[in-house]
From Swiss-Prot:
Miscellaneous comment: Heme 1 (or BL or b562) is low-potential and absorbs at about 562 nm, and heme 2 (or BH or b566) is high-potential and absorbs at about 566 nm.
Residues engaged in binding heme b b566: H97, H196
Record-given protein name: Cytochrome b
Organism of this sequence: Panthera tigris (Tiger)
Glycoprotein in keyword set: no
Keyword Manganese in annotation: no
Amino acid sequence: MTNIRKSHPLIKIINHSFIDLPAPSNISAWWNFGSLLGVCLILQILTGLFLAMHYTSDTMTAFSSVTHICRDVNYGWIIRYLHANGASMFFICLYMHVGRGMYYGSYTFSETWNIGIVLLFTVMATAFMGYVLPWGQMSFWGATVITNLLSAIPYIGTDLVEWIWGGFSVDKATLTRFFAFHFTLPFIVSALAAVHLLFLHETGSNNPSGMVSDSDKIPFHPYYTIKDILGLLVLVLTLMLLVLFSPDLLGDPDNYIPANPLNTPPHIKPEWYFLFAYAILRSIPNKLGGVLALVLSILILAIIPALHTSKQRGMMFRPLSQCLFWLLVADLLTLTWIGGQPVEHPFIAIGQLASILYFFILLVLMPISGIIENRLLKW
């Protein structure tokens, strides 16, 4: 068996990636999220495939086809809710994975980090298009509002929006193409994830200390396979609690009303995992400025390696940066809360303050704290 594992052209690749892979001996549970994201992606592709067998991407029948899946298809309700809540688990793992990368300085692996940012954008696009497919009120108006943001692009904006819509409003053409993209993009995400892993295995994993661990490596299997299975059990337990006890907890009740272009919901908002970016978008009164802030709130991750001023890689031994990091986490949670609130006082002011603080921490305070900590090392 060992000979096949090490000599067969295909099994050899799997062996070098998941079995005999040299891994640092001190990586913590924060390194579990990569494998959990892989599991989430497989779950989403499988449940999505079964949903696509019964779903119809037509404005007249989309809503009733989702109802049909839940009522008439064998275990259709559990497949639908696994898919919907699986997306929430996917984003929880994604944000924790990115947060770990920021905390422990994993962004110094620039190729892996940049592919990760492309992956994040692709997954966000996939999730947005998936939210449109049930063709409820929030699906329709969310699609209308978010795609309409592109009209802020000077000169070509309006033409671009109508090109994406396939007409003069969100209609059948929009729904059909969104379904086509939503079906295709997860496979592109899988390919990008393979490239992400390829770049990671070129350098080897980072570790909590941030130091080079070449002199102290252990095989991935059995040590980290067992550790990853523990994380997987926690993920599955959380997901099943959501699906079986409160499947609509993270959804919007408005999406149980069929899409009606003549009736606007009182408060249009995206899924909870986009609320922080939506709050940043809304905090700027100018449309183009809001769109730029929305894109930059994610794209800012690309310049984090350039803003690294500390002599140490991670934040494990940097108390000032640790305080700023957790302040950033609290700020993102505040933005998520604000994104779900109506546009009125005091939520507008809180959203604007939280948005300014978000960019100020990342662009100004973090680099300054790195310089101060370098000075403290000399004492």
